[in-house]
């Protein structure tokens, strides 16, 4: 049995807290990513991993030592690192004659590989080569995907989902306008994926809404899709399954229209409208003569009944 697969009993309170953090939760922690370079990674691949790590901070772990592994042939080492560092996302960089400047991006489910997609780097401009101001660490990016392939082709559709998982950052309930600081733009065109990073500049516009300008921040990559190893539809659905406790409870007799208006249905007993007290107006009051005639009529009806 593997050392990491054993049931570990904590001996101290600190170890107990550490293991409790890794236990399954209804609302999971922010997904961390590990960035690993292969045994033959060159300077380009190493710099790409460093730049992606700079964008992912503090939700990333950069492995500085080279690791000889092949993600498509054997995933045991990746699963070992995933369990050891509690990371559900990974990026692996390598370089060889057959596949130069190679990036493998993937994600885990229950510490087992779910999806792996291989990308080739054709052009790269580093974060440090673009001499502009950068965003502070931990800034949540805006993600933009352009191109029909992201919605049509299954490989590109799964790649889009994987990139959203990789760069989305923490889930927040509210966002202030000044917190929108940079954009990650992915374009799928003619079999290539163009990855660009821009800083958002809010300029004065003379009204309440500011004028927006984009300034390239880096890194910039031209990628091409190579190999893929995708999870089956059943396993993918299982990984997306939401716990029952988080599912919103259905409310009976409530419906919504296209404009978001809420309609409710109330069940009541039949009301006797003859006893309903209505508002009396002076103009509708009966005159004494009319009242006297009505009383006499009622009296005659009672006598006839008797």
From Swiss-Prot:
GO terms, molecular function: 5S rRNA binding; rRNA binding
Biased composition annotated in UniProt, kind: Basic and acidic residues: 290-300
Primary subcellular site in the record, as a coarse category: nucleus
Regions annotated as coiled coil: none
Alphabetical UniProt keywords: Nucleus, Ribosome biogenesis
Record's keyword annotation contains Nucleus: yes
Assembly behavior: Component of a hexameric 5S RNP precursor complex, composed of 5S RNA, RRS1, RPF2/BXDC1, RPL5, RPL11 and HEATR3; this complex acts as a precursor for ribosome assembly.
InterPro entries on file: Brix, Rpf2
Biased composition (Basic residues): 277-289
Cellular compartments annotated: Nucleus, Nucleolus
Protein role: Involved in ribosomal large subunit assembly. May regulate the localization of the 5S RNP/5S ribonucleoprotein particle to the nucleolus.
Residue ranges of domain Brix in the record: 31-234
Region (Disordered) residue spans: 268-306
Entry GO CC: nucleolus
Database matches in SMART domains: Brix
UniProt protein name: Ribosome production factor 2 homolog
Single GO biological process annotation from the record: ribosomal large subunit biogenesis
Family: Belongs to the RPF2 family.
Pfam families xref list: Brix
PROSITE patterns cross-referenced by the UniProt entry: BRIX (PS50833)
Gene name for this UniProt entry: RPF2
């Amino acid at each position: 049995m593997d050392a990491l697969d054993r049931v570990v009993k904590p001996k101290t309170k600190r170890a107990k807290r550490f293991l409790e953090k890794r236990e399954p939760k209804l609302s999971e922690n922010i997904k961390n990513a590990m960035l690993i370079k292969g045994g033959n990674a060159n300077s380009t691949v190493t710099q790409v991993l460093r730049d992606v790590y700079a964008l992912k901070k503090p939700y990333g772990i950069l492995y500085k030592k080279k690791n000889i592994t092949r993600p498509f042939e054997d995933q045991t080492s990746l699963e070992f690192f995933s369990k050891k560092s509690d990371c559900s996302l990974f990026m692996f960089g390598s370089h060889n004659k057959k596949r130069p400047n190679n990036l493998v991006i993937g994600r885990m489910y229950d510490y087992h590989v779910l999806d792996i997609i291989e990308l080739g780097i054709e052009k790269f401009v580093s974060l440090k080569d673009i001499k502009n101001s950068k965003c502070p660490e931990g800034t949540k990016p805006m993600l933009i995907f352009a191109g029909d392939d992201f919605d049509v082709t299954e490989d590109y559709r799964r790649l889009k989902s994987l990139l959203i998982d990789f760069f989305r950052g923490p889930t927040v309930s509210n966002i202030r306008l000044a917190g929108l600081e940079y954009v990650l733009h992915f374009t799928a065109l003619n079999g290539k994926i163009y990855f660009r990073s821009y800083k958002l500049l809010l300029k004065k516009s003379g009204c309440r809404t500011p004028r927006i300008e984009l300034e390239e921040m880096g890194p910039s990559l031209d990628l091409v899709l190579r190999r893929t190893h995708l999870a089956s539809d059943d396993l993918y659905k299982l990984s997306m399954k939401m716990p029952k406790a988080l599912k919103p409870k259905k409310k009976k007799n409530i419906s919504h229209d296209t404009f978001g208006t809420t309609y409710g249905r109330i069940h009541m007993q039949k009301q006797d409208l003859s006893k309903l007290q209505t508002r009396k107006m002076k103009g509708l009051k009966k005159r004494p003569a009319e009242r006297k005639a009505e009383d006499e009529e009622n009296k005659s009806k009672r006598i006839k009944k008797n």
